[in-house]
Amino acid sequence: MTGEGRPDRAVVAAHGIRLGIAASRWNAHVVDAMVERAIEAARSCGVTTPTVVRVAGALELPVVALELAHHHDAVVGLAAVIRGATPHFEYVAQAATMGLTQVAIQTGTPVGDGILTCDSMAQALDRCGLPDSAEDKGWEATVAALDCALVLRDLRSRAAAGMPG
């Protein structure tokens, strides 16, 4: 993992943005850290009270993200899918990721993809934002969703004012 090309871990001024976070209960040690980092990222961006809900697993994220998207300006889905000995990993990772993308496209609400798809628990721990992790995917997915919500807010306000986007 290089993180090459990743933007700086910046914050955006997202005061007034309503954020929903849906997180899996599978691989709780990893996902709990991602939730904590997502909440911290939201607060650093001015979103003081994000809605946080927990779901059974990664496959439940899209339907809950869809519901959150109806009442929030941005949504983040968080999970850790760890490869096992069967192809189940492939199906879960693809379905959950595609589901979050479909929610964003169908609703026009940005959905940050914080689904870790890792070959091992060690890889997941290295990406979940713990103090000794190399990456912080909960933070990154949250800032990305908030940033996109701000872009959409600006584009929509321009359109409402009759200005070109």
Curated annotation (Swiss-Prot):
DNA-binding keyword on record: no
CDD domains assigned to the protein according to its UniProt record, in alphabetical order: Lumazine_synthase-I
InterPro entries: LS, LS/RS, LS/RS_sf
GO molecular function: 6,7-dimethyl-8-ribityllumazine synthase activity
Transit peptide is among the record's keywords: no
GO process terms (BP): riboflavin biosynthetic process
Assigned EC number: 2.5.1.78
Superkingdom assignment: Bacteria
This protein's pathway: Cofactor biosynthesis; riboflavin biosynthesis; riboflavin from 2-hydroxy-3-oxobutyl phosphate and 5-amino-6-(D-ribitylamino)uracil: step 1/2
Reaction catalysed by this enzyme: (2S)-2-hydroxy-3-oxobutyl phosphate + 5-amino-6-(D-ribitylamino)uracil = 6,7-dimethyl-8-(1-D-ribityl)lumazine + phosphate + 2 H2O + H(+)
Active site residues per record: 88
Key words of the record: Riboflavin biosynthesis, Transferase
Binding site for 5-amino-6-(D-ribitylamino)uracil: 26, 58-60, 80-82, 113
Positions contributing to (2S)-2-hydroxy-3-oxobutyl phosphate binding: 85-86, 127
Sections of the chain in a coiled coil: none
Pfam families, sorted: DMRL_synthase
Annotated family: Belongs to the DMRL synthase family.
PANTHER family the record matches: 6,7-DIMETHYL-8-RIBITYLLUMAZINE SYNTHASE (PTHR21058:SF0), 6,7-DIMETHYL-8-RIBITYLLUMAZINE SYNTHASE DMRL SYNTHASE LUMAZINE SYNTHASE (PTHR21058)
Chain's role: Catalyzes the formation of 6,7-dimethyl-8-ribityllumazine by condensation of 5-amino-6-(D-ribitylamino)uracil with 3,4-dihydroxy-2-butanone 4-phosphate. This is the penultimate step in the biosynthesis of riboflavin.
NCBIfam families: lumazine-synth
Protein name: 6,7-dimethyl-8-ribityllumazine synthase
Source organism per UniProt: Acidothermus cellulolyticus (strain ATCC 43068 / DSM 8971 / 11B)
Taxon lineage: Bacteria, Bacillati, Actinomycetota, Actinomycetes, Acidothermales
Encoding gene, per UniProt annotation: ribH
